[in-house]
């Protein structure tokens, strides 16, 4: 479900302040954040933001194509290891 157009995009204030501070000083540091819900704005492009996936921070380099999406879209929270093959049934069939 998309957000109402009258509300506009959302970005956490602390994240926006950190990015603006780095842009003002022309620095490129990794920014740690737990805010997966924040929308990526054009002034984020070129920065690396470490987004929390529930157990660690995963670095994400922001490009032009990511503008308008949420930070959490680029960091999966679950790891799928596939279905475990049952060796007994495979031996019987062969």
From Swiss-Prot:
<keyword id="KW-0689">Ribosomal protein</keyword>
<keyword id="KW-0699">rRNA-binding</keyword>
<comment type="function">
    <text>Protein S19 forms a complex with S13 that binds strongly to the 16S ribosomal RNA.</text>
</comment>
<dbReference type="GO" id="GO:0003735">
    <property type="term" value="F:structural constituent of ribosome"/>
</dbReference>
<protein>
    <recommendedName>
        <fullName>Small ribosomal subunit protein uS19</fullName>
    </recommendedName>
</protein>
<dbReference type="InterPro" id="IPR002222">
    <property type="entry name" value="Ribosomal_uS19"/>
</dbReference>
<dbReference type="GO" id="GO:0006412">
    <property type="term" value="P:translation"/>
</dbReference>
<dbReference type="GO" id="GO:0015935">
    <property type="term" value="C:small ribosomal subunit"/>
</dbReference>
<dbReference type="GO" id="GO:0019843">
    <property type="term" value="F:rRNA binding"/>
</dbReference>
<dbReference type="GO" id="GO:0000028">
    <property type="term" value="P:ribosomal small subunit assembly"/>
</dbReference>
<dbReference type="InterPro" id="IPR020934">
    <property type="entry name" value="Ribosomal_uS19_CS"/>
</dbReference>
<dbReference type="InterPro" id="IPR023575">
    <property type="entry name" value="Ribosomal_uS19_SF"/>
</dbReference>
<dbReference type="InterPro" id="IPR005732">
    <property type="entry name" value="Ribosomal_uS19_bac-type"/>
</dbReference>
<keyword id="KW-0694">RNA-binding</keyword>
<comment type="similarity">
    <text>Belongs to the universal ribosomal protein uS19 family.</text>
</comment>
<dbReference type="GO" id="GO:0005737">
    <property type="term" value="C:cytoplasm"/>
</dbReference>
<keyword id="KW-0687">Ribonucleoprotein</keyword>
<dbReference type="Pfam" id="PF00203">
    <property type="entry name" value="Ribosomal_S19"/>
</dbReference>
């Amino acid at each position: 479900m998309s957000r109402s157009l009258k509300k506009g995009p959302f970005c956490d204030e602390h994240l926006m302040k950190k990015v603006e501070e780095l842009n003002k000083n022309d620095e490129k540091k990794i920014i740690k954040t737990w805010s997966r819900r924040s929308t990526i704005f054009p002034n984020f492009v070129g920065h690396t933001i470490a987004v929390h996936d529930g157990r660690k921070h995963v670095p994400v380099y922001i490009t032009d194509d990511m503008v308008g999406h949420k930070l959490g879209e680029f960091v999966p929270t679950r790891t799928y290891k596939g279905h475990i093959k049952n060796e007994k049934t495979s031996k019987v069939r062969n």
